[in-house]
Amino acid sequence: MSNTQTVKAVAKYIRMSPHKVRRVLNQIRGRSYQEALMILEFLPYDAGGPVWQVVHSAAANAKNNYGLDKKKLIIEEVFANEGPKLKRIRPRAQGRAYSILKPTCHITVIVKGTS
């Protein structure tokens, strides 16, 4: 029976809607580390950048903390949770003010590797 190790990396307070980030995360779920980086490199979405950084960080954690080989890593779990909303006010006509909610999210990547 092979020994598997899971490693986690989290990026918090990313100034992006979790809905838009999940669209990117669905593309890399269950793929190998190198395949995921290749996909993220060429996706036309802005969310690809922060997700690439978190995946890269998870692989670095696996290598430095547990001595795992990056080539053998598989993305086991990825998800984006909702963070706090930044509240802004936009002045409108006749003394009114509209509130603008700028969403943030927390991206979590869990990679699995065999030692």
Swiss-Prot record:
GO terms for molecular function: rRNA binding; structural constituent of ribosome. It comes from the Eukaryota. Its main location: plastid. It is found in: Plastid, Chloroplast. One of its GO terms (cellular component) is large ribosomal subunit. Belongs to the universal ribosomal protein uL22 family. NCBIfam families: rplV_bact. Part of the 50S ribosomal subunit. This is Large ribosomal subunit protein uL22c. It comes from Trieres chinensis (Marine centric diatom). The gene is rpl22.
